[in-house]
Swiss-Prot record:
It comes from the Bacteria. Homodimer. CDD domains: HisRS-like_core, HisRS_anticodon. Its EC number is 6.1.1.21. Belongs to the class-II aminoacyl-tRNA synthetase family. Pfam families: HGTP_anticodon, tRNA-synt_His. It comes from Thermoanaerobacter pseudethanolicus (strain ATCC 33223 / 39E). This is Histidine--tRNA ligase. Gene3D superfamilies: Anticodon-binding domain (3.40.50.800), Bira Bifunctional Protein, Domain 2 (3.30.930.10). SUPFAM superfamilies: Class II aaRS ABD-related, Class II aaRS and biotin synthetases. It catalyses: tRNA(His) + L-histidine + ATP = L-histidyl-tRNA(His) + AMP + diphosphate + H(+).
């Protein structure tokens, strides 16, 4: 057990980490052009934040949170999602007092105790964006656009955007009465979880993936038929923004998401090539969450995207992430003096921005050159007593095998100019 990662976790080795770096770099580029600023929140929070924010009827709170009592007697939870901590930071640091909206993004590990399966680990990584302070449906459309832009730039084109409105507390109260009346006649056929949801938050029954529950809810009354004028207008406005951007979408009344804080907009983006497990992004609006967590009455909207699931989706679609280029220069040496000299030379060239490697294993010259090939080095030089004396080396282009003699002082500029 000592040499094995805990169940539901995974090491990201160098053979895979370049993929993460590429995606995270693209995320940062996209968020920058959209005007989102990065926020980093702690890995754990007071449990009460998630009880109030995520909602006590959710599977996350009821079954999946990693909660413990610390040495000070406080109930602490490893964060299971990114929105509530971002809201807490927004309130704690009085960001609501600044000119709005506040546009944030994060890339963070999150923790949920659930059955490990493909794309769903107990520790996984989430990319999310949040817009606080904007009630217009244009903010909803903007966060959707961020997600769609990332997915399309990664090469995922066969996407399906599904949208819904889950209403506000006023119109949802009326809908819940109608829904409970509908479900009451089939209560015995609902799964045990949905029997609890029926009492606490019946809307969540629509989100159940159990087949017997889905058979019942497929004939359930549609929440879109019970929206108040404000929610209906907001949903229509969102569709206009999506239309003007040229995004195809499907109105799906079953999209309610698995968190209690959603109001009005709820959406999912699905990779159609993958099928039922193809949801790569989900989010929506949460106009009551900031106030629920102790802040002022301010609207919010955002999404979360699991990076493990995204990487699997790319792989299943045959999309390869470009591997990083090899080192710029490998410096081989012969002799003890050259060993010290090349160490200093490598350090100088690295400081000036070149990717340089040299041998730290005291290999033979032949073995050093073999190592240079393994590193996919673009260029290589060999420095020995004669090269140090003459201040000249043969710069070998490892890609084509050609050589050119240059002074040691020319190495940096010559490589940068090629």
């Amino acid at each position: 057990m000592l040499t094995k990662a805990p169940r539901g976790t995974k090491d990201i080795l160098p053979s895979e980490s370049y993929k993460w770096q590429y995606i995270e770099g693209l995320i940062r580029e996209i968020c920058d052009v959209y005007g989102f600023k990065e926020i980093r929140t702690p890995g754990f929070e007071h449990t009460e934040l998630f009880l109030r924010g995520v909602g006590e009827s959710t599977d996350i709170v009821r079954k999946e949170m990693y909660t413990f009592t610390d040495k000070g007697g406080r109930s602490i939870t490893l964060k299971p999602e990114g929105t509530s901590p971002a809201v807490r930071a927004f309130i704690e640091h009085n960001l609501y007092a600044e000119t709005q909206p506040t546009k944030l993004y994060y890339i963070t590990p999150v923790y949920r105790y659930e059955r490990p399966q493909s794309g769903r680990l107990r520790e996984h990584h989430q990319f999310g964006v949040e817009i606080f302070g904007a009630k217009s449906a244009s903010a909803d459309a903007e966060v959707i656009s961020v997600a769609m832009t990332l997915l399309k730039k990664l090469g995922l084109n066969n996407l399906e955007l599904r949208i819904n409105s889950v209403g506000c507390p006023v119109c949802r109260k009326n809908y819940n009465k109608v829904l409970k009346e509908f479900l009451k006649n089939n209560l015995e056929y609902l799964c045990d979880d949905c029997k609890v949801r029926y009492e606490i938050n019946p809307l969540r029954v629509l989100d159940c993936k159990v087949e017997s529950c889905q058979r019942i809810t497929k004939d359930a009354p549609l929440i879109t038929d019970y929206l108040c004028d404000d929610c209906k207008s907001h949903f229509e406005e969102l569709q206009k923004y999506l239309d003007i951007m040229g995004y195809d979408y499907i109105i799906d009344p079953r999209i309610v998401r698995g968190l209690d804080y959603y109001t009005k907009t709820a959406f999912e983006i699905i990779s159609k090539d993958i099928g039922a497990q193809g949801t790569v992004c989900g989010g929506g609006r949460y106009d009551g969450l900031i106030e629920e967590c102790g802040g002022p009455s301010m609207p919010g909207v955002g999404f979360g995207m699991g990076l493990e699931r995204l990487l699997i989706t790319l792989e299943q679609n045959g999309i390869e992430i470009p591997k990083p280029e090899g080192v710029d220069l490998f410096i081989a040496y012969v002799g003890e003096e050259a060993k010290l000299f090349t160490f200093a030379l490598a350090n100088k060239l690295r400081f000036n921005g070149l990717k340089v490697e040299r041998d730290n294993m005291d290999r033979s010259l032949k073995a050093q050159m073999k190592y240079a090939n393994k590193l996919n080095a673009k260029f290589a030089i060999v420095i020995g007593e004669e090269e140090m004396k003459e201040n000249k080396v043969k710069l070998k282009d490892m890609r084509v095998g050609s050589e050119v003699e240059i002074s040691i002082d020319e190495i940096e500029q010559r490589i940068k100019n090629i």
